């Protein structure tokens, strides 16, 4: 009986630590998401994932390119040694058309939550797999640098399930040396 209670208590504790990715899209047309994008807003389940320009998950997506194999090449900029560095990452397709895996700071899952293809896309990057640790970063991408308040509201609603989220809204008119702008 003591072992059963201990197992139940541990499973409840671990369940509270997990961070679930909000619902993903049913279908995703890779050809439609291809092209230039701008990181407009970032949200994290833990502030330490975004609290400086050089943290590994604070990246600025610039372009998405579908590959002939059905994968997705992601061109991004990130802070490194007080400079912006461009990187290309290939996200591998999975059975779910809106979910990819990527080897970036460990193997991670990228889930596309929503897109209208012409104006916005929301996605989340989960913690390294397999992992019980929490730590998810989500982004609102837009085809232009202009923040659409309606879409920002929709982004916020899509992320309601994330515990302790922190939102950072980028200033597109801000400094030129900031990565992505």
UniProtKB/Swiss-Prot annotation:
One of its GO terms (molecular function) is retinol binding. It is found in: Secreted. Disulfide bonds join 84-179, 124-138. Pfam families: Lipocalin. PROSITE patterns: LIPOCALIN. Belongs to the calycin superfamily. Lipocalin family. Monomer. This is Beta-lactoglobulin-2.
